[in-house]
């Protein structure tokens, strides 16, 4: 049976891994998942991410903790298969007054809401991270 929402699966694996105190989580890889993981790494929410190229590529994410607590307090899906959420640059959400990020898929690639706003791009809001 195929997975209907691989991005939700990725976010759930990260959330469950941090709640369980895991060092790293692994999942099937895709270009979009790697792009999301790259943004999370650039913003300091995860330690590292790498793709293990086998017959089925696997994405491995090293989780980050500060003082024994997960760095990611909240991570959840915004746009989903049943209800896509597209926003123009003016309508991109500010998460926790700018302390969190929204990950946006634009025509120029996957980036944070702040980056998309600064280059004047809108797009599909994939998820929120705080």
Swiss-Prot record:
InterPro entries named in the record: Ribosomal_uS8, Ribosomal_uS8_CS, Ribosomal_uS8_sf
GO CC terms, sorted: ribonucleoprotein complex; ribosome
Transmembrane segments: none
Gene Ontology molecular function terms on file: rRNA binding; structural constituent of ribosome
Gene3D superfamilies recorded: 3.30.1370.30, 3.30.1490.10
Keywords: Ribonucleoprotein, Ribosomal protein, RNA-binding, rRNA-binding
Pfam families documented for this protein: Ribosomal_S8 (PF00410)
Keyword Ribosomal protein included in the entry's annotation: yes
Keyword Ribosomal protein included in the entry's annotation: yes
Cited SUPFAM superfamilies: Ribosomal protein S8
Signal peptide span: none
Positions of disulphide bridges: none
A GO biological process held by the record: translation
Complexes and interactors: Part of the 30S ribosomal subunit. Contacts proteins S5 and S12.
Protein's name according to its UniProt entry: Small ribosomal subunit protein uS8
Species this chain originates from: Nitrosococcus oceani (strain ATCC 19707 / BCRC 17464 / JCM 30415 / NCIMB 11848 / C-107)
Name of the gene: rpsH
């Amino acid at each position: 049976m195929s997975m209907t929402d691989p991005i939700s699966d990725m976010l759930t694996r990260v959330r469950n891994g941090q709640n369980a105190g895991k060092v790293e989580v692994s999942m099937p890889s895709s270009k979009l998942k790697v792009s999301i993981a790259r943004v999370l790494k650039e913003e300091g929410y995860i330690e590292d991410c790498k793709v293990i190229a086998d017959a089925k590529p696997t994405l491995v994410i090293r989780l980050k903790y500060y003082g024994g607590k997960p760095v990611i307090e909240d991570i959840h899906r915004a746009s989903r298969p049943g209800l896509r959420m597209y926003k123009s640059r003016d309508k991109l959400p500010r998460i926790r007054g700018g302390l969190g990020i929204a990950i946006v898929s634009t025509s120029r690639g996957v980036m944070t809401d702040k980056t998309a706003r600064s280059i004047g791009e809108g797009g599909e809001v994939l998820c929120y991270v705080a």
